Amino acid sequence: MVAARRGDRAGANEFLAEAGLVAQRLGADRNDFWTVFGPTNVGIHRASVSVELGDAGRVVEQARAIDPSRLPSLERRAHHLLDLAQGYGQWRKDHEALDALLHAERLAPQEVHQQPVVQRLVVELLYRERRTTKPRLRELATRVGVLAA
């Protein structure tokens, strides 16, 4: 993630490839000592890297290929959905972004409500608000603290 945040696409992909090999050797998703790791978690990190690099289409493609129900942690499942929401937001598919945010909120409300990235995305969606998303979006905006009740 650090490499992606620095804009180092090659470095990020190199780290992901190495993690993918280790996950493949492990063979299954594990949660030993609260350290979730395995093929699914590496897939989630691939999507996260794509979010950081602004590759919206790849985020959505990678996120759709992941079965988050294989992860024992609700927070990791929610994080995956937040990546998907950001990808849809970057792609300006606001209805899909909102659906992913609401799904993440159902899984781990405290996690979603405290994330600055969620607040920024909700503000962005409010600027582009459509009639079809307005009631649900405004309710979410209130819950995450970017719109007064």
Regions from the PLM with identified roles:
Residues M1-A149:
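Conserved binding/catalytic microenvironments
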